[in-house]
Amino acid sequence: MRLEDLRPTPGAMKKRKRVGRGPGSGHGKTSGRGHKGQKARGSGKVHIWFEGGQTPLQRRLPKRGFKNINKKVYAVVNVKVLEERFEANEEVTPEKLIERKIIKDLKDGVKILGDGELTKPLVVKAHAFSKSAVEKIESAGGKAEVI
């Protein structure tokens, strides 16, 4: 076998379709677009959401709800995470939570939730607490302070 003997696998090199190049090509005159109509025209594309003139789905369905621009979005932390990542009598602040990569950013503040158990007394400073989180922090001998 020599370099000049190399040939592409049959079917690997597909010929380019040259449309509008006479009747002998098989793609002449109308260039494979058929006769007249929207799709035969230059800019005759239909959007993927076009439903043939019937009222589109997004207009058939009723309007519902709204997005509250004043809603607070908290970065949430569960009590079990505080148990794992902090020592007894340590102070937990939003800055320390970011520093230890427990949360990415503050958003509208930090909310402590009550999933898991807490055995160490901790001084937790956050923007909001759930009732169960406050109970667990205080029963472990710690303090829950709202910033």
UniProtKB/Swiss-Prot annotation:
Binds to the 23S rRNA. InterPro entries: Ribosomal_uL15, Ribosomal_uL15/eL18, Ribosomal_uL15/eL18_sf, Ribosomal_uL15_bac-type, Ribosomal_uL15_CS. GO terms for biological process: translation. Part of the 50S ribosomal subunit. Belongs to the universal ribosomal protein uL15 family. It comes from Thermotoga maritima (strain ATCC 43589 / DSM 3109 / JCM 10099 / NBRC 100826 / MSB8). One of its GO terms (molecular function) is structural constituent of ribosome. HAMAP family: Ribosomal_uL15. GO terms for cellular component: cytosolic large ribosomal subunit. Pfam families: Ribosomal_L27A. Keywords: Ribonucleoprotein, Ribosomal protein, RNA-binding, rRNA-binding. This is Large ribosomal subunit protein uL15. Residues 1-46 are annotated as: Disordered. The gene is rplO. Residues 30-44 have a biased composition (Basic residues).
